[in-house]
A protein has these predicted regions:
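Signature of the catalytic double-stranded beta-helix
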Residues: 133-146
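Short, low-complexity disordered leader/linker segments with a strong preference
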Residues: 1-39, 351
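N-terminal secretory/targeting leader peptides
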Residues: 26-131, 146-351
Length: 351
């Protein structure tokens, strides 16, 4: 073989290898044409894709990518709110039974079955997104184990990310950002009620629809829940006082049916998990934009005549100290593992 022929052969091999890299073959092997067509149902707690930015990010990244990488053979249908007729509190059970394949949910609805995920809504444990991320990473192993144990391995946590900050809005001014005595405040659950009572107020648990009616009728003088939802509901038309305390943020979780997952071809499993991991990383990178969107929402309240009371760093520290008994009681009620995770979080945060 001539020297030129050898050089040509080497060059040809290099060109072929570069082509394979550029076409993605080095990362994603070609899928077999014999792989089956599969359709999954992914239910989202948000009532629509516009309601929750994090849900939108997941849906618009994972679903098209999985479809493209499987040549259109693995389709994931996004279902919003009540389309399947499954209440958010029942998502894990629906996944465990195989009636649902994926669910995006606010885990606060599932604290009854999985008490340890109540750690994500401990009031005043975190006061900014940097602190939130620290605690989320510490708590995640406990959440993964809890989902697995609660549903006998039939439910798996695949994505964890930030939800929205809970703030207090009122029709009647509070005595101070530290003193809510004399106010009846709508809350969504027991943890929120404990926080309101610690601040001297009275918490009343109602549904979302009942909250709006109660505000109009004066049954309650305020609401304590995530600020984005209150803005979307135009509560600024009734509540003219906003107390920015970043009381709790909470998680969103994407949970998956292992029954459905185990039925997938290995190629589909790998692609799905890869795309979920990419979307999760992207969602963490959008924490700063979440803050900017909060600023935009706050301006909407200001433009509608609301008084904005921003907690100072000293007030946030004092509020956090007042809530320590709540953290310790909740963790103790959950069990030793929750106590240990809380200790790790407090050490990491210096609280």
């Amino acid at each position: 073989m001539s020297k030129n022929s050898i050089l040509f052969s080497i060059l040809l091999v290099i060109i072929i290898m570069l082509s394979m890299v550029l076409l993605g073959y080095s990362q994603t092997p070609a899928l077999s044409s014999e792989l089956p067509k599969v359709t999954w149902k992914w239910n989202f707690y948000a009532m629509s894709i516009e309601d929750e930015e994090m849900a939108k990010n997941l849906a618009t990244q994972v679903i098209p990518a999985v479809k493209e990488r499987t040549g259109g053979k693995f389709i994931i249908e996004a279902l919003w709110g009540p389309e399947l007729g499954i209440a958010p509190a029942n998502y894990p059970k629906a996944l465990a039974s195989g009636a649902l394949d994926l669910a995006w949910t606010y885990p606060g609805y599932n604290i009854g079955d999985i008490p340890i995920i109540g750690l994500c809504v401990l009031p005043m444990l975190v006061s900014n997104t940097e602190e939130y991320k620290i605690t989320a990473e510490i708590f995640r192993p406990g959440y993964e184990k809890a989902y697995e144990e609660a549903y006998n391995g039939a439910v798996r946590l695949v994505v964890q990310g930030p939800y929205n900050w809970a703030q207090l809005v009122t029709t009647k001014p509070a005595k101070s950002i530290m003193d809510w005595s004399g106010l009846k405040i709508r809350v969504a659950g027991k943890v929120e009620m404990q926080y309101i009572e610690t601040m001297g107020g009275t918490g009343l648990m109602t549904t979302w629809d009942e909250m709006v009616t109660s505000l109009r009728q004066g049954v309650v003088q305020g609401a304590f829940t995530d600020f984005g939802s209150m803005t979307n509901a135009k509560l600024y038309e009734m509540c003219k006082n906003v107390y920015v305390v970043n009381a709790m943020m909470g998680d969103h979780h994407v949970i998956m049916s292992t029954k459905s997952f185990d039925k997938l071809p290995k190629e589909y499993q790998d692609i799905l998990l890869e795309e979920m991991a990419k979307a999760e990383a992207y969602n963490w990178s959008t924490i700063v934009p979440v803050n900017s969107r909060f600023g935009e929402a706050l301006k909407t309240w200001e433009d509608n005549g609301a008084n904005i009371f921003q907690a100072t760093p000293e007030e946030l520290k004092a509020l956090s100290a007042l809530c320590v008994p709540i953290w310790e009681k909740i963790a103790s009620d959950i069990g030793p593992e929750a106590v240990l995770l809380l200790q790790k979080a407090r050490t990491a945060l210096g609280k």
